[in-house]
């Protein structure tokens, strides 16, 4: 690990550009740049890294990106991926009890709808759910809880803000898809830049 710091203009970005370039061209080590602001790492496209992949999810982008969070690596168990998904959701959005339990149940439910069992190992022969299916499943699970009207209404509002936000406009084009632009394992096999400036804090964390 390395921590690169310095005052503005000290050369932090140029240092990182040099490191990324050298890793791929000299050592054949792929890199994944998550750029939360600006588009400075596009400078690498002006070098001789011919296989550089750039994603810039935004309206009218020339470099669109699609990520289905329910698609996971071959050889991984569904149970393990559901736990990873829960960690991602809880890290990206504030979820107070009982929302995590409801979300966990809904995630497993949408996989069940596509023929998955929790102990299944991904062999690439089953379809993955989508975010819109999760949203519909959450509404179903919420209607079947024993919470009173006010609590249920608060939970519905929270889910609308968190999960519903991933369905609207540009974010829907990124996350509410059946197939990702790259398979999960491919994200660590190529030199890749993902520009996240237009996505907002919560979705970027997600």
Q: Residues of each region from the PLM?
A:
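Walker A (P-loop) ATP-phosphate-binding motif of ABC ATPase nucleotide-binding domains
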Residues: 1
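The conserved Walker
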Residues: 7-8
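P-loop NTPase motor domains
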Residues: 18-206
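Hydrophobic anchor at the beta1->P-loop junction of P-loop NTPases
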Residues: 4
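Conserved lysine of the Walker
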Residues: 12
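Hydrophobic positions on the alpha1 helix immediately C-terminal to the Walker A/P-loop
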Residues: 15
């Amino acid at each position: 690990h390395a921590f690169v710091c310095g005052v503005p203009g000290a050369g932090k970005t140029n240092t990182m550009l040099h490191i990324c370039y050298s890793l791929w061209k000299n050592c054949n080590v792929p890199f994944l740049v998550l750029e939360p602001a600006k588009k400075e790492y596009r400078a690498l496209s002006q070098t001789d890294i011919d296989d550089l992949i750039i994603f810039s999810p935004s309206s009218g982008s020339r470099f669109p990106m699609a990520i289905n969070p329910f698609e996971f690596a071959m050889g991984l168990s569904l149970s393990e991926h559901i736990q990873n998904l829960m960690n991602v959701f809880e890290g990206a959005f504030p979820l107070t009890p009982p929302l995590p339990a409801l979300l966990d149940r809904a995630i497993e439910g949408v996989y069940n709808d596509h023929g998955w069992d929790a102990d299944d190992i991904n062999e690439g022969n089953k379809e993955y759910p989508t975010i819109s299916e999760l949203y519909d499943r959450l509404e179903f699970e919420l209607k079947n809880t024993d919470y009173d009207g006010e609590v249920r209404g608060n939970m519905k509002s929270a889910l609308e803000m968190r999960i519903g936000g991933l369905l609207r406009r540009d974010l829907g084009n990124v996350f509410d898809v059946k197939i990702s632009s790259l398979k999960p394992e491919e994200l660590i096999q190529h030199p890749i830049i993902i520009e996240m400036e237009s996505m907002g804090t919560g979705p970027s964390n997600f």
